[in-house]
Amino acid sequence: MTMMDMNFKYCHKIMKKHSKSFSYAFDLLPEDQRKAVWAIYAVCRKIDDSIDVYGDIQFLNQIKEDIQSIEKYPYEHHHFQSDRRIMMALQHVAQHKNIAFQSFYNLIDTVYKDQHFTMFETDAELFGYCYGVAGTVGEVLTPILSDHETHQTYDVARRLGESLQLINILRDVGEDFDNERIYFSKQRLKQYEVDIAEVYQNGVNNHYIDLWEYYAAIAEKDFQDVMDQIKVFSIEAQPIIELAARIYIEILDEVRQANYTLHERVFVDKRKKAKLFHEINSKYHRI
């Protein structure tokens, strides 16, 4: 195993640890593509964790500087400051793919702002956040998952990322409240007459369910729009993207089956993932 192979393996371990659903799906890509996904995922994870986990603004600055070095001089040797193994893997990807570096910087800017979290006044602010933390990831992955990326390809990948982030929010309402965060907008909380603290303490009510389903309907519509345009991605990537997205959309039904609980994180079990795998395998005859 070469040193570069070890770098990609390290990135893969990060992805498997933090997103079993993504790993389950994207590990089925051809080798070069899946390695690129591992590297990009690992970079995005380190960006996300720099503040939330490490509480280290300097580490986030180092990540940004390392990415800028790769963008400016992709073929030069660099003394990376953040995580050398991840950055070497990213540099290798950047030498072969047209990486949308600005999307990395947009993600970093969102993480900077997230240090001083305040509730969103409107849904427009919430959806802007979903772009910043996840739509950006879709943009960065676009050259890996398509043969000839176009404006439409970037738009579809961006919308998929935003949809998956909204599903994360719908899954983690209670966990986020424990961490003193409410991502639903004040505008929509007022409209549906919902107080998350009250729901957390006293249990789910019809107002909360209506609010939750309002956002779920948005995520489901975006998911369907992506599925309707999935052919913008490469033939190899189409079944993989559909598998990852369908595993994620299944989370919404898991929340429903758990009676919208705020006190337990739901997940899609291996049996259901395997069922989705076989359904999509039959559809595409490829995986």
Swiss-Prot record:
<feature type="binding site">
    <location>
        <begin position="18"/>
        <end position="21"/>
    </location>
    <ligand>
        <name>(2E,6E)-farnesyl diphosphate 1</name>
    </ligand>
</feature>
<protein>
    <recommendedName>
        <fullName>4,4'-diapophytoene synthase</fullName>
        <ecNumber>2.5.1.96</ecNumber>
    </recommendedName>
</protein>
<dbReference type="GO" id="GO:0004311">
    <property type="term" value="F:geranylgeranyl diphosphate synthase activity"/>
</dbReference>
<keyword id="KW-0125">Carotenoid biosynthesis</keyword>
<dbReference type="GO" id="GO:0046872">
    <property type="term" value="F:metal ion binding"/>
</dbReference>
<dbReference type="GO" id="GO:0051996">
    <property type="term" value="F:squalene synthase [NAD(P)H] activity"/>
</dbReference>
<feature type="binding site">
    <location>
        <position position="248"/>
    </location>
    <ligand>
        <name>(2E,6E)-farnesyl diphosphate 1</name>
    </ligand>
</feature>
<feature type="binding site">
    <location>
        <position position="172"/>
    </location>
    <ligand>
        <name>Mg(2+) 2</name>
    </ligand>
</feature>
<dbReference type="InterPro" id="IPR019845">
    <property type="entry name" value="Squalene/phytoene_synthase_CS"/>
</dbReference>
<feature type="binding site">
    <location>
        <position position="45"/>
    </location>
    <ligand>
        <name>(2E,6E)-farnesyl diphosphate 1</name>
    </ligand>
</feature>
<feature type="binding site">
    <location>
        <position position="52"/>
    </location>
    <ligand>
        <name>Mg(2+) 1</name>
    </ligand>
</feature>
<dbReference type="GO" id="GO:0016117">
    <property type="term" value="P:carotenoid biosynthetic process"/>
</dbReference>
<keyword id="KW-0808">Transferase</keyword>
<keyword id="KW-0479">Metal-binding</keyword>
<feature type="binding site">
    <location>
        <position position="45"/>
    </location>
    <ligand>
        <name>(2E,6E)-farnesyl diphosphate 2</name>
    </ligand>
</feature>
<feature type="binding site">
    <location>
        <position position="41"/>
    </location>
    <ligand>
        <name>(2E,6E)-farnesyl diphosphate 1</name>
    </ligand>
</feature>
<keyword id="KW-0843">Virulence</keyword>
<dbReference type="InterPro" id="IPR002060">
    <property type="entry name" value="Squ/phyt_synthse"/>
</dbReference>
<comment type="similarity">
    <text>Belongs to the phytoene/squalene synthase family. CrtM subfamily.</text>
</comment>
<feature type="binding site">
    <location>
        <position position="171"/>
    </location>
    <ligand>
        <name>(2E,6E)-farnesyl diphosphate 1</name>
    </ligand>
</feature>
<feature type="binding site">
    <location>
        <position position="165"/>
    </location>
    <ligand>
        <name>(2E,6E)-farnesyl diphosphate 2</name>
    </ligand>
</feature>
<dbReference type="InterPro" id="IPR008949">
    <property type="entry name" value="Isoprenoid_synthase_dom_sf"/>
</dbReference>
<dbReference type="InterPro" id="IPR033904">
    <property type="entry name" value="Trans_IPPS_HH"/>
</dbReference>
<keyword id="KW-0460">Magnesium</keyword>
<comment type="function">
    <text>Involved in the biosynthesis of the yellow-orange carotenoid staphyloxanthin, which plays a role in the virulence via its protective function against oxidative stress. Catalyzes the head-to-head condensation of two molecules of farnesyl diphosphate (FPP) into the colorless C(30) carotenoid 4,4'-diapophytoene (dehydrosqualene).</text>
</comment>
<dbReference type="Pfam" id="PF00494">
    <property type="entry name" value="SQS_PSY"/>
</dbReference>
<dbReference type="GO" id="GO:0046905">
    <property type="term" value="F:15-cis-phytoene synthase activity"/>
</dbReference>
<dbReference type="InterPro" id="IPR044843">
    <property type="entry name" value="Trans_IPPS_bact-type"/>
</dbReference>
<feature type="binding site">
    <location>
        <position position="168"/>
    </location>
    <ligand>
        <name>Mg(2+) 2</name>
    </ligand>
</feature>
<feature type="binding site">
    <location>
        <position position="48"/>
    </location>
    <ligand>
        <name>Mg(2+) 1</name>
    </ligand>
</feature>
<comment type="pathway">
    <text>Carotenoid biosynthesis; staphyloxanthin biosynthesis; staphyloxanthin from farnesyl diphosphate: step 1/5.</text>
</comment>
